[in-house]
């Protein structure tokens, strides 16, 4: 029993010696450089103000600091999508629904070329900053009435090549451009575009819609500059389109004639597209309502003569009349008799693929054309 104390007593000098060596080592000058951290947290420390640093040091001294590790501020991105510069690209992924976790600051969302069939109420929740949305080439046939409500600042909506049968409801008032062509829309109800006073452009061609499919007041309140209803089932110029129109494209329909009152509302038109229809006649005076018209498309119709009224259109510059049944061109069909009555010369007149021979047309017929190369003439029929 006497060996225990003796052992502890004998070890004390050794412990004291080791302790003295450790203290001496710590007191000795060191030539090593201090550790310098490089990484995310260095930037975080650099951005912290002196007050925040002092608070942290005081907490450590008082023992009240809690360890909290924050992850880097990396934005979310739906699985399989590409997110860059507030553009989220989720096209060509075979998606059957709108993906989750779309960053709330997204400006443009690309969902085209997928297999989405429905837009649900909360699909775009939180995306109030969205500027453009592409849903082109999906299988969407159903849209919840409140699906677009969160999109307070959206200006462009691309909805072509889907299975829509009606215009979606409650579209954002901020909308400027909408493309809903190549769907299955047969009817546009009254007030379908209500509240869209900022809308500038609507492309809704290639829908199986007839004239009767546009209810009275369908376009009420719109101040459009551009409207295209091509490749549809129209047999006449639709009624009550926006008076503000600058461009109206009704090509590739089944329109058979242009009546006197058809164009009365559209005094602001610059460009009118009526090509690829079945038009045999434009009633005398029907073009007189278009004083600002610059470009007129009547190609691929069944006209037998140059429409009346062209010489009185002071700003008309381009007329497409090719591929018709025009067999004769009069000397005053294009140009006014009085000098200086026309404000701008023609820079394009197409008459090829008509049964009229160019040598039978008097040179004075084109006296108000800027250059003879602007006249496209030929004697072949497609």
What do the predicted segments below correspond to?
Residues 100-103, 122-126, 145-151, 168-174, ...:
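A structural signal for leucine-rich repeat
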Residues 117-215:
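A generic tandem-repeat structural signature
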């Amino acid at each position: 029993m006497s060996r225990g104390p003796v052992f502890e007593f004998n070890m004390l000098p050794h412990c004291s010696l080791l302790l003295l060596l450790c203290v001496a080592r710590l007191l000795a000058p060191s030539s090593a450089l201090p550790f310098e951290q490089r990484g995310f947290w260095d930037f975080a420390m650099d951005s912290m103000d002196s007050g925040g640093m002092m608070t942290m040091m005081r907490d450590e001294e008082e023992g009240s600091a809690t360890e909290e590790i924050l992850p880097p501020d990396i934005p979310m991105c739906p699985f399989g999508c590409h997110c860059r510069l507030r553009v989220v690209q989720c096209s060509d992924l075979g998606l059957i629904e709108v993906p989750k976790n779309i960053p709330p600051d997204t400006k443009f969302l690309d969902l085209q070329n997928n297999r989405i069939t429905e837009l649900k109420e909360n699909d775009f929740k939180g995306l109030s900053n969205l500027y453009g949305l592409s849903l082109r080439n999906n299988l969407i046939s159903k849209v919840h009435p409140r699906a677009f409500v969160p999109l307070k600042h959206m200006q462009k909506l691309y909805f072509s090549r889907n299975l829509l049968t009606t215009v979606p409801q409650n579209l954002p008032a901020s909308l400027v451009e909408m493309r809903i062509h190549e769907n299955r829309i047969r009817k546009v109800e009254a007030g379908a575009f209500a509240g869209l006073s900022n809308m500038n452009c609507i492309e809704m061609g290639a829908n199986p819609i007839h004239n009767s499919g546009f209810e009275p007041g369908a376009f009420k309140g719109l101040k459009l500059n551009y409207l295209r209803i091509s490749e549809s089932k129209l047999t006449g110029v639709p009624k009550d389109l926006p008076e503000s129109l600058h461009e109206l494209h009704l090509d590739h329909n089944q329109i058979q004639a242009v009546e006197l009152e058809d164009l009365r509302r559209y005094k602001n038109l610059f460009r009118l597209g009526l090509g690829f229809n079945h038009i045999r006649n434009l009633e005398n005076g029907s073009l007189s309502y278009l004083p600002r018209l610059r470009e007129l498309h009547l190609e691929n119709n069944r006209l037998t003569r140059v429409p009346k009224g062209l010489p009185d259109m002071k700003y008309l510059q381009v007329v497409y009349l090719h591929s018709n049944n025009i067999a004769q061109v009069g000397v005053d069909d294009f140009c006014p008799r009085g000098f200086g009555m026309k404000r701008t010369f023609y820079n394009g007149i197409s008459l090829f693929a008509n049964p009229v021979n160019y040598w039978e047309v008097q040179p004075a017929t084109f006296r108000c054309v800027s250059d003879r190369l602007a006249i496209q003439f030929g004697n072949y029929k497609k």
